[in-house]
Amino acid sequence: SVVDGFLVIRFQIGGSDRIGYMQPVGAGDFTPVLRHLEEDILAAGQRLRIIDMTPEGLEKLRSVGHCQFAFASDRNLEDYVYNASDLRDLPGRKYQSKRNHINRFEAEYEYRYEPMTRDHAAECMRLEAEWRKTRSGHTGELSAEQRAMQRAFEHFEELEMLGGCIYVGDRLIAFTYGSAVNDHTFDTHVEKADTDYDGAFTIINKLFAQ
C-alpha cells in the first residue's frame, strides 16, 4: 500500500506467520511512516521487523528517538554481485570449475538457447515444480517463490523482464529471468535447472549474461 507517499510492502517471512516489512520506498525521509507500521504490527500482536535495509535507511532508523531497534545481518539472505563480463567470459583460475562444467555439458548435449517470452511460462512452471520436488524443507519459502514466478509471468512485459531458456531436444532443462535495477545493474530473480543435466545451471548463467 501507499502510506504518506511511500510504498509499503508487507509480507510473511519465509512463509511463516511472522510479518515483515520492506524498507518504505519513496522520496525523502520515511521515518514518519514508522508509526503506521507500528500500529499495523501491534494489531497483529507482533514486533516490528524491517527487512533489507539500505545503509542510508539504517542511519535514518538510528536517528529516530522514540524507536529502539536491534540490527542484524544474515549472510544467507545476501545477494551475490558479479561483473557481467566475468559471467560472460569466466576468466582465470577462479572460474576454472565453471568452465569445466560447461565443457562437459557442451560435449554431451546438443542444445539451443532461446530468449524467454511469456509463452514459455507453462514449461518453466513445470520445470520449477520438478525442481521443487528435490528440495526438502523450506516449503513456505518455495511456495512463495512459486507464486512470485506466476505473477512475474502474468506481467512479464509490464515488469520489463528479460530471460532465457535452454532446451535439449524439445525438453526445457534450464531457465532464468530478471530485470534491470538501473542502467548499470541487472538483478537475476530466478534461475532453475534440471539437475540431471550436469552443467545446466552454469551454462544458463553464462549464456544469459551474454
Regions found by a protein language model. Give the residues of each.
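Conserved GNAT-fold acetyl-CoA-binding loop/helix
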Residues: S136-Q150
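Short, contiguous, pocket-lining structural segments
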Residues: R93, S97, M116-H120, E141-A144, ...
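Structured helix-beta-strand junction loops
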Residues: A44, E108-Y109, L159
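Acyltransferase donor/substrate-recognition loop-hinge adjacent to the catalytic core
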Residues: C67-H138
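A structural signal for short, well-ordered beta-strand segments and their strand-loop junctions
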Residues: R47-M53, V81, Y113-T117, C165
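Short, glycine/charge-rich beta-strand/loop segments that flank catalytic centers
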Residues: Q46-V64, N76-D79
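Conserved donor-binding loop and adjoining core beta-sheet/short helix segment
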Residues: S1-E56, Y167-T195
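Accessory, usually C-terminal, subdomains that scaffold auxiliary metal cofactors
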Residues: R147-Q210
